[in-house]
């Protein structure tokens, strides 16, 4: 190939006509500056979320009674937040740790991890972490004078029944 290209001083391309192209390669009317959008969009609707609350009330609904739900005592609130942090953080941390271990096993060629294993791990651990929010709040004893059990199963059963009583 090298001998073929070097054997001629001038390439055969020089025999092409040297006429200039008479058409322009671009039309200046179709070019848009980079700092301006191609088309201007206009809002066709007005804001609806900033109206007064009186116009959006339904006539058949009574006003909620502020005394209907008593406030949660600070001690119970702190216990509830602690339970939520533990019941969310434990499966979340475990899930991240398992994914990291699976990554190390695959990188060091110890175990060729099937693709479904990380997906299943993520589903189980992160899903139980999401359920931990509800369990953390349900497993807290709502009486400030009483203490919680270790896992809160008894409190969760009591609070579950109480929660469904209030709805009916």
Swiss-Prot record:
Residues 55-64 have a biased composition (Basic and acidic residues). The chain crosses the membrane at residues 84-104, 113-133. One of its GO terms (cellular component) is chloroplast thylakoid membrane. One of its GO terms (biological process) is NADH dehydrogenase complex (plastoquinone) assembly. Disulfide bonds: none annotated. Keywords: Membrane, Transmembrane, Transmembrane helix. Its main location: membrane. Pfam families: DUF3464 (PF11947). It is found in: Membrane. Disruption phenotype: No visible phenotype. It comes from the Eukaryota. Residues 18-73 are annotated as: Disordered. It is a multi-pass membrane protein. Has no redundant functions with PAM68. This is Uncharacterized protein PAM68-like. The lineage of its organism: Eukaryota, Viridiplantae, Streptophyta, Embryophyta, Tracheophyta.
């Amino acid at each position: 190939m090298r001998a073929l290209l070097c054997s001629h001083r001038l390439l055969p391309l020089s025999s092409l006509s040297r006429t200039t192209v008479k058409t322009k390669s671009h039309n200046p009317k179709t070019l848009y500056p980079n700092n301006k959008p191609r088309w201007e969009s206009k809002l066709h609707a007005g804001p609806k979320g900033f109206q007064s609350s009186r116009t959006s009330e339904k006539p058949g609904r009574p006003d909620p009674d502020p005394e209907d739900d008593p406030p949660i005592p600070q001690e119970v609130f702190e216990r509830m937040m602690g339970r939520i942090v533990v019941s969310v953080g434990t499966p979340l941390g475990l899930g991240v740790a398992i994914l990291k271990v699976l990554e190390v096993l695959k990188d060091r060629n110890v175990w060729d991890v099937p693709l479904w294993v990380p997906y299943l791990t993520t589903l189980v651990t992160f899903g139980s972490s999401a359920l931990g929010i509800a369990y953390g709040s349900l497993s807290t004893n709502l009486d400030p004078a009483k203490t919680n059990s270790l896992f809160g199963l008894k409190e969760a059963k009591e609070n579950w029944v109480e929660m469904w009583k209030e709805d009916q």
